[in-house]
Amino acid sequence: MLKLLLGDPNARKLKKYQPYITEINLLEEDIKVLSDEDLKGKTAEFKQRLAKGETLDDILPEAFAVVREAGRRVLGLRHFDVQMLGGVILHSGQIAEMKTGEGKTLVATLPSYLNALTGKGVHVITVNDYLARRDAEWMGQVHRFLGLSVGLIQSSMTPSERQKNYECDITYVTNSEVGFDYLRDNMATSMADVVQRPFNYCVIDEVDSILVDEARTPLIISGQVERPTEKYVQAAEIALTLQKDEHYEVDEKARNVLLTDEGFAQAEELLGVTDLFDPEDPWAHFVFNAIKAKELFLKDVNYIVRNGEVVIVDEFTGRVLPGRRWSDGLHQAIEAKEHVDIQPETQTLATITYQNLFLLYPKLGGMTGTAKTEEAEFERIYKLEVTIIPTNRIRRREDLSDLVFKKEIGKWQAIARECAEMHELGRPVLVGTTSVEKSEYLSQLLREQGIPHELLNARPENVEREAEIVAQAGRRGAVTIATNMAGRGTDIILGGNSEYMARLKLREYFMPRIVRPDDEDVFGVQRAAGLPTGHGAGQGFVPGKKVKTWKASPEIFPTQLSKEAEQLLKEAVDFAVREYGDRSLPELEAEDKVAVAAEKAPTNDPVIQKLRDAYKRIKQEYEEFTSTEHDEVVSRGGLHVIGTERHESRRIDNQLRGRAGRQGDPGSTRFFLSLEDNLLRIFGGDRVAGLMEAFNVEDDMPIESGMLTRSLEGAQRKVETYYYDIRKQVFEYDEVMNNQRRAIYAERRRVLEGQDLKEQVIKYAEKTMDEIVDYYINVDLPSEEWELDKLVDKVKEFVYLLSDMQASQLEDMGVSEIKAFLHEQVRIAYDLKEAQIDQIQPGLMRQAERFFILQRIDTLWREHLQQMDALRESVGLRGYGQKDPLIEYKSEGYELFLDMMVNIRRDVVYSLFMFQPQPQPVVQTSSEMV
């Protein structure tokens, strides 16, 4: 009712931006007639206008019109009005909700171009290396055409490559890389090692996945700590003998375990110890982790074992996360459970959450298909508004009502039947599953029924073919099973993706003849000259595969190439070999040539022109088939998406649904659920158990009930609230750390940039002297009773060069005079020390100052992080004593921080006065942290 009276706030907001769109459209004709050179010249013109005092908003309409025209010329894509609207919203620092297939990637070019004109740099953030690389190659062409530099950060890059890429006007990078680089920069020991510029503006693609789903996971850089591996092995054996419910209880919701009294007794007896918590020989931590590993972390669901290593599977995207490890000894406990080599445990050196990382940007915008469900969170934590952008074409997707089964087995059989029916009809099907294990179970059922299908999950052999499988998922009768398709980045095009197939065919012929043999490393991420890039589309890692063939599965191509097309392709590749040399390019550079050949950007390279002609011809031949098939699939109802379990968040369910019915295509979705699904079991509780009894139906008969659907949605809302509270708590606690982190990193940066740190060290020394005076002199006592001899001894402890000082020198002075006298003495002593040191090597004292300050900051900050962790755990228990844990954490954390700052000062003063370099060798100015 209120909406009717006040109007929809979203519509009001869109209306406010409408004049921009009108103005951009009016400029379109004028800009269309410009030559390529004149269009490129606009960039310099805009920069001059900004220098003369115009604002970004003043030049927005013309800048957006220029990007639209550049996109049309280079990519053959013209931004629709709704995409322009999305661009304006991103530029104004909001979140734009745009449905799947509405061209979010193209929208990002608008605000990133406009904000890059300031010269301060723009980051376009994606969820994985493959997408960052794809966007930098694809959308980067628009920016390069307009004269801006485009950078790309990939996980395998060296610091100097990172530095070069962050210097670019627009840098494509994943959220984790930008976070780890920020932390590493704040551990650098010289400015030359710092890779990032100060943050300015970023556009986050799939913003909900990064700012909401990943917000519970802090980024951590860690160093190794030695811990006895046999303790993990013993604890794993004990966990096997302990019985659930008798010796321990499992809290699935909080993902925690609690030992019962019997459990403690049993574990202590088996280990032959009297107390699991004995500080001299602690066992509790190992035993708890071993039980968690047994009960809460399941193989092929939470992790897979590959090449003798435990590799985490991301619960949101279903991708493997090689190199990431669970902390606090949990990963080691799982390694012990799986009988693989146990890697050393780690200690946190630096950490930040994504929430606080992205709050460091003065302005940020984000895009996603599903943000409205988390609108409150975006506004509370990030102060970001969500604006829904209308779709360009009317949506024709049909969301069918859920089918709920009593038993899980009945549900899977029904899904297999539905796949078979759709396959018969010739409709493509996409099934989203929540784990590797479930996807393989369904695959087995379909194999038994003889239904051809593709499987896409975290297993390495499937990862490699990811883009290839997705390109096929829209073909007639195709059945694709995928673990969490969230944010997969490759669109499912009905009838098949002819562009991608043509690109694969080009790679198949070109790569084996051009790639340098030594460069074919198993992971396909060798460093290369030229454009710094990472994983090629559809590349991955296949253990034991030493020689790459680049051959795609033959059934991926819709038809045999004509003789003419094949001839054209062979000639283009022969010409490339003549020009570049046989097997002469690094793999990534070769991937790059294929990528550019498959685009429309102007090029002067004759090899790319020839490859492009061949590519166009192949694409045209494939298109004849795919376009007929497209019409056929559309007439049969389009893509059918099956969800096999409700996710923790309605948003991820909506992302899965959003794969169907893109850009006005028809499509349908349906969720198949069972009363044994995790969500219902953990959060639906007893009500559902009661319902199960009430429904006296067969296992494979679907139940449709309003009460059940409401129960389901209630459970999902409960989960969302539960996780929102966790994220809010993570945020509130990290907020305390964040203020401390900013202070310490700012101090560190001052030291890194400071040319002359002598004054800073002297300030430290003076402050230390003041603290000694305040400690030993009680102003309430008469001066005869002051402990001047102890005071002088303490001063000499810090500054041995003042060994001649006597307490009698201070006898007739007041407190402020003593302080002034000590300040003077400490300065003289420091000059003396400097003269001694610089005799050994001129300028050595300056290097020593920087080294000691950084080393103390790093070492004490590292210890402080551990103290704060311990404090956080202990304040949690105070909640029982009617005290607010957060307030306790804030006040005690602040005390710890002040203590640390004092200790840094004192340690630096002490270390510098005690510093006795040996003649000859130069002091190494690198801290122990790196």
Curated annotation (Swiss-Prot):
Record's catalysed reaction(s): ATP + H2O + cellular proteinSide 1 = ADP + phosphate + cellular proteinSide 2
Any single Gene Ontology cellular-component annotation: cytosol
GO molecular function, one term: protein-exporting ATPase activity
Keywords for the protein's UniProt record, in alphabetical order: ATP-binding, Cell inner membrane, Cell membrane, Cytoplasm, Membrane, Nucleotide-binding, Protein transport, Thylakoid, Translocase, Translocation, Transport
Pfam families cross-referenced by the UniProt entry: P-loop_SecA, SecA_DEAD, SecA_PP_bind, SecA_SW
Assigned EC number: 7.4.2.8
PANTHER family named among the record's database cross-references: CHLOROPLAST PROTEIN-TRANSPORTING ATPASE, SECA INNER MEMBRANE COMPONENT OF SEC PROTEIN SECRETION SYSTEM
NCBIfam families assigned: secA
Self-association state and partner proteins as the record states: Monomer and homodimer. Part of the essential Sec protein translocation apparatus which comprises SecA, SecYEG and auxiliary proteins SecDF. Other proteins may also be involved.
Function: Part of the Sec protein translocase complex. Interacts with the SecYEG preprotein conducting channel. Has a central role in coupling the hydrolysis of ATP to the transfer of proteins into and across the cell membrane, serving as an ATP-driven molecular motor driving the stepwise translocation of polypeptide chains across the membrane.
Protein name in the entry: Protein translocase subunit SecA
Organism: Trichormus variabilis (strain ATCC 29413 / PCC 7937) (Anabaena variabilis)
Gene responsible for this protein: secA
